Amino acid sequence: MDGINQIKKLKDIDPFQIIIRKLTTGVQLEYEELSFILSVSILFLQEYQKDKRRITYFNFAYFVILKVALINKLYQPLFDLSLNVGFYPINRFIYEKKLIESFSLESIKNDVEVDAYRYDKHIEMYQQRLNRTEILSSESLDNVYIAPTSFGKSSLIFDIIRINYNKKISIIVPSKSLISQSIIDLKKIFPDRKIIFNEDMYDNEESFISVFTQERALRFFSKNKKIYFDVMIVDEAHNLLPNDYRAVILARAIRRNRFRSSNSKHYYLSPLINESKSLQLEANQVFFERKIKLNIKEPDYFEFKEMGDFFKYNRFLDESYRLGWCENLYEYIKYNQKNKNFIYLRSPKKVEEFSKRLCHRLGLNEKLASLSKILSDNLHEDFYCVDYIKKGLIYLHGGIPDLIKDFLEYKFETEADIKYLVANSVVLEGINFPIEVLFILNTTDLRIKNLINLIGRVNRLNEVFSNDNDDLLKLNPNVHFVNDTYFNGKNRDMYHKMKLLKSSLFEDSVENPALLNTINDQLKNKNTGINVVQDNSTENISTVRELEDFLIYDDQKDNSLLKTIIEQDVHNIYNEFNQVHEILFGRMERYLISSFWMGLNIIDKIYYFFIKDFDYDLKIKSKKFLRFNYKNTRKYYNNFVYRMHNLSLKSHINHILKYYDWLGRNNISKYKKFYIGAGFGEIPYWSGNKNNTCIDLSLKSRKQRANLALVHLKNETDFVNFDLLKFVNILYEVKLITEAEYNCFIYGSEQRENINLFKAGLSTQLISFLKA
């Protein structure tokens, strides 16, 4: 029952249309107009009180009352509404900043009552306090907290840890960046607790806090057959819903923990789930759900057209109002900038290109010279951000090494003079940036719920009610949709994407075949084609769900080669896995007693076990592994693993640049068709291929090659850590490599001291530096 159509019908009333246009475009209302529109708002609030499903009625009334406060400086209606619906932080802010000229005795009494909602140096909303209390006191094993972005999910996590202090606790997060941020936050609150963020840091503790991605959680379970988490907190739980591999293994990690401990408590936190049944993993699973349906923030939406006209959009009336004209998108962004500006694009290459173009129009800031020197000294003098950061701009995308990405994120958060962040979807998963205005330059593949999540990052609540603010303008964040053919594509007007925001209700799209309520019947019933031999009988695993059941319910049995391969998702690289599995099983038995095998390095072992003679099966689904047929490729990756652990970032980049120079000097064909991946590719690998995955290094300047080397380094590091590591884990599980070989691949050393330092949280590069 959205109600948006009922509101749109009021457009036919001229005074109503005129007043809404004024409120949308920031024009003060006359006394008669105020009286009329506030009366209309009261009617909508009364209808909402009759039926709480009519959330759009409340949202519209709140929009009007908030705008009246911000434009006409008439705060009494907002004060009264906030008191009635429990938006108590607004009441406290209005009272402390004296935004109402004279408070009645009743208002003073109400402020004293509001103080009862003080929690950890801030005032909570009524629903926020109620939900937090009920979630924490819940005896249910499965608890779901659904609330808009920045509505206290982090503080709820800390509370869950406090009431389970001496237990085994794990927070499951979707990205390595969130691991880093979570560790920093947890260390501040729980300085004496051991925090595990790598599966190898566990040392048989009875009580700990861990922060894992789903991949690390499963590796933790694989290495510790009996361990379980008493409490599992799944952050950004909407990541269970899509049809992708990471969603499937997230479901696997949750189910495995519950299988190992039937009394484990699970908490699911998300701003984007519509109803908890979408998360259902088992038929008997019952959720205790608490949800905040009302959003205290009401964004303003702007659209810049490529010809220069710009408009303001009212989502309730589905109307756009022309505001003016600007010469180009760069001038438009500069005209609408605030202290912290976030520009969103999709492609890593476009992220860099836009950063370059905007920086040409920005002036130098001498205060940032020292930061620029840090990047130059520790990364490379030709890294684009060395120049850009001096103008108050940084960019982020998946091709930047994690260490540098973490550093840049931290500096954007803490350094006031860095005003521009240009990035893609790497920021979608919970990173708490201090963003004051959002410019969206591309909406390709940006689903409506991800768009809402992105918008929710602007003006987090702790920034809205900061004592540094003199008003409540941050309750009304600015979101700009900026059209440009180069950055968004031809004939892709963002107006149509913006119109989707007029609704307040969005159904869950449950596509993960491991979930019970998946809507994707085709995937749900798709035959995996895997046969399992158990108790001398052959059993066909026909669906993804059956495959997951096989992995979960056989959890405590000895690891077979088959199960280990499936756990690592290596079965999916082969076209006919059943035939391949029989050959792999024979190789395992043969290599266990082979002197030839013992003399191979670990990369050669990967080749001889998983790749050799499987060209037909690999070329259909996993062509990237066929290059290991070449001895030089295997030699390259053997050396790369060593450099990855022992060289600094700067040394490694210089090594790659020397490699590029060598390719050029020796006229190697690879120099003019170098594989860099789809994100930065400009030409296809072979004629007729539609995918541009290669570059011609001979056409690139020294500076361009240095930045491509950075991407190259990140790509290769990810390939080792995600693709080759799966092979290494399997070989180790089935005892085809020694612990020393495993340690050298993972830690870069056989020395126990180095391994212990790594388990304490130090990187292999830092360990090498400290021991140099």
State the predicted function of each range.
Residues 1-772:
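N-terminal helicase ATP-binding lobe
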